[in-house]
Amino acid sequence: MQGLRPIVEFAVFGVLMLLSVASVAIALERLRFYRQVDARLYASRARLESDLTRRLNVISTVASNSPYIGLLGTVLGIMLTFQTLGATGEMDVKSIMTGLALALKATAAGIVVAIPCVALNNVLRRRVRERLTDFDEAHGG
């Protein structure tokens, strides 16, 4: 079972890294789009809103779910630690604490991914509201 620890860590941290890179890429693309878009040229507010909010749900989903992914890594790490202790029959405090500390880093990583994603989502949603206000002002709304 000890051989599963690197696989669990790689999977959890790999998923979190992938999600964070995807979120940053989407945020950069959206910021570039918001700078270039002219809301006054849209005939429909619904079409503008659809274009402005495209892929923002990915960032909010990453923000809300990355702590759970980290928590899953922590739970699996704790399970592996206790399984190893049960299999060896040794109650060495050092190995218990080391195993638990390593398991908790997954939760920390999930939170580290979530916090910037929440901030990015808030900034991008604010830009959407600004562009929609531009549309409303241009179309007498």
Please place each PLM-identified region on the residue numbering.
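Hydrophobic alpha-helical transmembrane segments of small proteolipidic membrane proteins, enriched
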Residues: 1-40, 46-132
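Cytoplasmic juxtamembrane regions at transmembrane-helix boundaries
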Residues: 129-141
